[in-house]
Amino acid sequence: MINAIIDLYTKADIKTISSKLLRSSRWQQHHFTAMGSLQAQPLWLDFLAQYGVSELISKTHSKGQELETLQLILQPKKLLKPVRLSFVIKHNNTFIKSVKCVVDTLLLANNEFTGEASNNTLVIPKLPKSDPIMVCDLDNQLHPTTFHATPSDICELPTQTAETLNNWWQIWQLNNLANFESVYAKNADVILAGSNETQSKDALLNCHLALSQTLSRCYAQLETVQFDSALNQATICWTLDGTFNAKNIRVRQQILTVITITNTLISSEVMQFDTLALNQQFAL
């Protein structure tokens, strides 16, 4: 499964990955859900046509009980700088049941084409029409009495890992920003959407504060949690609902976070989301 996804981008091998998808298989990308290979192929062809076949710079692969995570850094032939794609995959060793693919479109938009014939210096990805969605408002009376799931509620985790991830989740669900000091190692490495550069945990705090200024009445909610005990690495798919202040509309940002834990502290974190797909979905 992993090699089939890698070969799709590095060899333009559409046949192999198509054979892994059933009609009921879901491939989610750019906030759009494709059912089966016939609907997914246009997504793959658009990427290959716009950016070309890629060279694999690096890959990171982790396994949980039901899900696998694949992180790729690719160097497309038509672009000057590498791009990052992250996948959360569910399969039965024969067929793929679902794939959640997060393309860092902000990194693409900040990229440039290599060919002099191209007049466009900004790489604007060709995006499909997003899935229709209605984001409910936050009920201030119901919210305090509602059960709010934590990572350990939806994934079997070692005790110390559960405590670390639950405390991390409080940063986003409860705005407990003091946990940045207690949950992260002092020299923790952070990679955020829009950049391949490693940053400090201060960049993550600044990201949280920037989101708080852009979105009000926020609510963070878990989708899936996967844990690889061999790598001590967790992958969390989650959403952040909020009112986009500039237009006073409710939006939902889909986020994929990969966390590595060392000695009960977070030593590295990759936080990815599709910025341009969000802008298109809600006309921001």
PLM feature spans:
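A general structural-boundary detector
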Residues: 4, 27-30, 76, 152-155, ...
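A solvent-exposed, acidic/Ser-Thr-rich amphipathic alpha-helical stretch
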Residues: 14-66, 177-231
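Soluble or luminal CAZymes and related metallo-dependent hydrolases
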Residues: 1, 39, 81, 160, ...
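Short, low-complexity N-terminal intrinsically disordered segments enriched in polar/charged residues
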Residues: 1-19, 23, 107-178, 182, ...
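Hydrophobic alpha-helical core bundles mediating ligand binding, dimerization, or RNAP-core interactions
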Residues: 2, 21, 44, 70, ...
